[in-house]
Amino acid sequence: MADRRVGKRQMGQRGFSKVESGTCNVCSAPCSSCMHRNVGFTGSKLDESSDENCHGVVGSQCSVNEDDLLPSSMVNAHKSLNNTASEASNLVNSSHDALSENAESKETIRCSGISDDSGAAAMTSKPSLSGSRMKHKVSASANMLDQSSNCIEDQEDGILSADRAKQLKSGCSNNEIGNKDLADGSALNSDPIPGGSRKDEVKLESLQNPSSNHDDRVSSEKGNFKEKSRPGGNKERQEPSVEGSTRSGENRKDGKSSKSSSSNSSAVSESESDDSEMVEHDVKVCDICGDAGREDLLAICSGCSDGAEHTYCMREMLDEVPEGDWLCEECAEEAEKQKQEAKRKRETEVTFNTYSSGKRHADKIEAAPDAKRQVVEASTGSPKKSILPRVGALSRETSFKGLDRLRGKLNHQTSFSDDTESARSAGSQLQPPKGAFLKSSSFNCSSSKPKVQLMDDAIHPRQKTGKEDTALDLKVGGFRNVGKSMPSRTTDAGNSGGSDSQAKMLGSKVYHSQEGKSLKQVKDRNREANASASSIDQKLKSRGNSSVSHANNNRDLKGLQSDGKRGNLTKQVSNLSRNRLENSVVSGGDISTNEKCSASEQSSSQADCKDELPSTSCTGEGMPNHGTVALQDGLPRSRVPREVGKKSKEAFSKRQRSSLLAGAKGLPSSQKGGQTAESSDTSGVSDSDLSTTKNVKEDLNKGNRLRAAVDAALRKKPSFGKNRVLEQSDASLVANVDSSSEKTLRNQLPSKMHKNHVSHEGLQGGHPILWPTSDPYKQTIVTNEKQLIFPGADTIPSRLVEPEVSFPAVKPVMRDLPLVPSPVMLRSSAIPDHEFIWQGDLEVRKIINQSAMHSGIQAHLSTLASPRVAEVVNKFPETFSLNEVPRKSTWPTQFEKLGTKEAHIALFFFAKDTESYERNYKPLVDNMIKNDLALKGNLDNVDLLIFASNQLPSNCQRWNMLYFLWGVFQGRKETNPQKNTSLPTSNVLPRDRDPKELCQTSSPSKHLEKGSSLRESSSNGIETRNGTDARSHENPNNRESSIERSPSKKEDIALKVEEAGVNHIPPQVTGSNSGDSLVRKVQKVEEQELGGRKDLPLTVMGSGIQSHGQDNPLEKDLNSSQASHRKRPLWELSNPANENSSAINQKVELNNDGLCEGSPNKKLKTENGSSSLCRDTSGHDSGIMKKSPKVVFPLDLNDDSEMVDNLSPLGNDENNNNRRLISGTVPNLELALGAEETTEATMGLLPFLSRSSNSGEQSNNSMNKEKQKADEEEEDDAEVAASLSLSLSFPGTEERKNVNTPLFLFRDLPR
């Protein structure tokens, strides 16, 4: 009945086969009676398999339909293919006759006879079938008919059929040898036959395993037979040839032509191996990447001919192909485990036989093994070796064919065990063969590229294990991508067993064709598990899937055998492997601990997880588990000895990363607050692991607490500055990295911390501080960034960092944590507070004297901002006035040198809503980016600088994919309020030049002496104040005192750059200096623009100059003409000061105020101003600064009279002469070198350089002329000022234009 059922199935699959009656070309006997079925069947290996799958029914159907269906063209084609064609036709004819004679007997006998005949015929007829798949089908059908006829004849005359079977073997082998090349070519071309898809698949399988095509055929026939005999019909689809072999075995069992079938199958396998061999030799594919890649870097395994790996794909990359013998990973492991493999194979056979006995009749089971053994024996003589055991691995048969001939018997036995195993578990076998068969068939369709396609499917088997499809119940029958799950070279049972790494990467259930492998692996795993786990049987407590974990302690093959279900067996296998790895699992939900595998077996465990239960989630695959299971595959088992330690480590690190990331995506931690990794629910954790975990936890707590205490203490110190915070926090983080790398993850901490423990960032020194919400010692263990949670009572209330990440409970210690990217927000990243700290309007005053109102702007405090930022921002008015200035003018020097960072951001400015963004915010940002502008405002002595985010590093230029505005605060550079800050500093002497020297440049030596004495008395304190002010712009006292000035004055003092030519006039300012109690009034007067300059009459009232202690107030009416900050003012003293002290002291103070300018040009101009100042004094006091016969220069200007004579005309012709002298004179540098000066040149010098000490009239004239000349000079210099304007602002708000050219002379003077 089983045969008939099989036959019917095969008929359903191959009802199209056609056969023509004829005589055997070898023995001239009817094909039905002759066993020589070399007719074109060799070309159709697929036909064999399909015929085998459809043996009984096909035979009957063929007898019915062969005459009608078989086109003559096919017969002709067979004939044209030499003996194979004629034999095929003869076989078809004879088989047709025999079938017509005994249709029913054919059905019964057909299974064995057809399988045998088809095997032989397929071997012989491969070339003809390669010509056309129709031919293959016809030949297959003919073979089936012949087989059926042979079976009938055998029934009539069993001896004759046996003899003919022997003859057929010899004839087929001869024909195959003769037509080997033709068969190969025909095999390549045999795909077009529509009905021969299975045939092609079979062929491809055989081709893939050329070394043992014979064995493959036998094993496949056996497997098919088992499948057919078993209720599952998938086996028939998978490998008809296997079914044929099994049927042949059954026939033998029944006493029917078993010998002939075995011989035929062996012959067919040989021919198939021949045909496939050619194709296989053409392609060498890397087992790892699945591509030919660089052939010069492709290392070929010397142990197994099919093993190949690129040097750059190897676990340990090599620079060049190794010389001499090189063993692939599988072969290397096989060498160590050959003995174990043999034992496993025997046990596997027993197990599978026992298991399959429940599903098949005992006699059939025995017959199948016998047939398999016979076929194996016949196939052992197969001359060809499988070059593509990987491809063969897709099919049970071929998976074992990659073994060396030395292991050929073992392989055959393995295949037999696999066949019995498949017969035992029809569903399981059908599925793996299905996946394999489908792949193999697809590859066979393109026989020229079987390996390449297979490799494509099996690309990176080790890497793809983590990406394999989620668990598919093999019983359900879902097709698995075997190529992905299985390593390309695990085709051999020995290879698969030997290479545990690849087998591990493969699910233990990857193939039931490879279940022998899995059993072997299980056995190895059991042994290793026994060694590593030290007889610790850990029960898996998966609440949802008891069946998955019910085989917790079943490490014996007996338990596996007793278990009648393959799923349970595979589960047991996975459990055993897991037990060996001692992976801890949190019980809960549907999560099975089986999914947890050591790093070395992550792949296999993943496959197991996928195959075992759909409900189980494989965290190794990057899929989040139900909160109970922490990173299952991410648990390093360093103590577990593995041959593949490095591989497992690499895979583990990858899996760890993926699992951590997956877990970080929202895996809720189901553990309770007090629950740790050692909870009773955790299974598979060894005592050593538990102790290690405890120790690590203790160390972690101690180290973190210590660090937290130290950091908190440091933070409390006032000197704990921003930079120190950075350095210390960085150092602590680094230290944390070392310690936390061996600390457990959040699963060791209460889940309460996981959920509630959010990293908070306080603003201390501009850097974030992580705060625990409750317990200061509860610290979030960040995998990559070891962030300390600083418990401190003095810190600012923390703000939540977005987003909040909850880690999955991880068991046990994650030693590779440093490799895992931290999903927590980095401490150094600046994030705007969710709540805005200020909301209002920005009034932007543009450079072109226009203003624009931008409403709906709100400021958000940065998480890295200093606490003082909040204080300042709280004082922001609702409408904040800002100046639009070029960015470069306000760009801090720190940014120029070091660049900008996220940590520099103090405020984020955003629009409050979409409408405000479109109307106001976006245009403002675009304009600033386009024109490289910045916004500058000041408040409370602090400048607010706002820039566009395009100036930030590229990784933080956008927020929500949009550019934004960010602000920083900068202390304003101000003069000391104790100084005469109300007066323009542009009118004073440079601070870095000694007033004595300045006097020397403009007065005789005696006057210098007098001036020196006055300076010593008056400027000691003043200079000291000035010097202090030069270095104390950041002094808070300075800021506070400067705040007393009017806001407009503040703006003038601010460090903003004014465009050249823009006149900045100080408003009326009243200031008081605590030091000298000098009170000055600067009255703003009408501006007079003369070529860009302004004349400001300034009235200065002073009482009690500080140094001299003089209480007489000074009232000075000063005419300051200026066009820019550089413009030299002309001072006019309205009241005669005290002869020596008042006037000179006043001059000194003014000069001292100019120090902050720090520019030579300014210095020179202030000297002019000071000279004019002194000239305004009366009597001897004013004469101090006048020109005398003795000059300051190294040269001696003796012609004072001449100079005076020349100066006198200035008073007569002020306009003409003055202009002529000023415009025509250039600085005569020869004067500094001691050369004679001409009248013109001397006059060109400032008037204070030429003064006669003898003539008071001349001094008065020179004073008047100097005033006029100064006015003229200012007018002329207004044009030159713009190019030399400095980008500095001073307490004096006036802008001075370029220096007079004659003043360059002073630069060369010695000092």
From Swiss-Prot:
Which residues bind Zn(2+) 1 per the record? C286, C289, H310, C313
Q: Where is the composition biased (Low complexity)?
A: 258-270, 1280-1289
SUPFAM superfamilies named in the record: FYVE/PHD zinc finger
Whether Cell wall biogenesis/degradation counts among this entry's keywords is no
Bias (Basic and acidic residues) ranges: 213-240, 460-472, 512-528, 553-566, 640-653, 1026-1050, 1087-1096
Query: Which ranges are annotated Polar residues under compositional bias?
Result: 411-431, 487-502, 529-552, 569-607, 668-694, 977-988, 1014-1025, 1250-1263
Mutant lacking the gene: phenotype: No obvious developmental defects. The double mutant aipp2-1 paipp2-1 exhibits multiple developmental defects, such as a dwarfed size, early flowering, small leaves and poor fertility. Abnormally up-regulated expression of many genes localized at H3K27me3 and low-methylated H3K4 enriched loci associated with a higher accumulation of activated RNA polymerase II phosphorylated at 'Ser-5' (Ser5P-Pol II) in the double mutant aipp2-1 paipp2-1. Plants missing all PHD finger-containing proteins (e.g.
Q: Which UniProt keywords apply?
A: Coiled coil, Metal-binding, Transcription, Transcription regulation, Zinc, Zinc-finger
Q: What does the record list as GO biological process?
A: negative regulation of gene expression, epigenetic; negative regulation of transcription elongation by RNA polymerase II; regulation of photoperiodism, flowering
Q: What is the effect of changing D306K?
A: Lost binding to unmodified histone H3 lysine 4 (H3K4me0)
Stretches of the chain forming a coiled coil according to its record: 328-348, 1256-1276
Start-end of PHD-type zinc fingers: 283-334
State which tissues express it.
Answer: Expressed ubiquitously.
GO function terms (MF aspect): histone binding; histone H3K27me3 reader activity; zinc ion binding
What InterPro entries does the database record attribute to this sequence?
AIPP2-like_SPOC (IPR056280), PHD1-3/5-6 (IPR049914), Znf_FYVE_PHD (IPR011011), Znf_PHD (IPR001965), Znf_PHD-finger (IPR019787), Znf_RING/FYVE/PHD (IPR013083)
**Residues covered by region (Disordered):** 1-21, 114-141, 178-280, 369-390, 411-440, 460-701, 975-1050, 1059-1078, 1087-1138, 1152-1186, 1249-1311
- Gene3D superfamilies, alphabetized: Zinc/RING finger domain, C3HC4 (zinc finger)
Q: What is known of its domains?
A: The PHD domain (283-334) recognizes specifically unmodified histone H3 lysine 4 (H3K4me0), binding affinity being inversely proportional to H3K4 methylation level.
According to the record's subunit comment, the protein's assembly and interactions are:
Part of the BAH-PHD bivalent histone reader complex that contains AIPP2, PAIPP2 and AIPP3/BDT1; the BAH-PHD module associates with CPL2 to form the BAH-PHD-CPL2 complex (BPC) for transcriptional repression. Binds directly to AIPP3/BDT1 and CPL2, but not to AIPP2.
Q: What is the purpose of this protein?
A: Together with AIPP2 and AIPP3/BDT1, cooperates to form a BAH-PHD bivalent histone reader complex able to read histone H3 lysine 27 trimethylation (H3K27me3) and low-methylated H3K4 histone marks in order to regulate transcription, especially to prevent early flowering; promotes AIPP3/BDT1 binding to H3K27me3. CPL2 is subsequently recruited to form a BAH-PHD-CPL2 complex (BPC) in order to silence several H3K27me3 and low-methylated H3K4 enriched loci, including AGO5, via the phosphorylation state-dependent inhibition of Pol II release from the transcriptional start site (e.g.
For this entry, the protein name equals Protein PARALOG OF AIPP2
Q: What is the lineage of its organism?
A: Eukaryota, Viridiplantae, Streptophyta, Embryophyta, Tracheophyta
Which gene specifies this protein's sequence?
Answer: PAIPP2
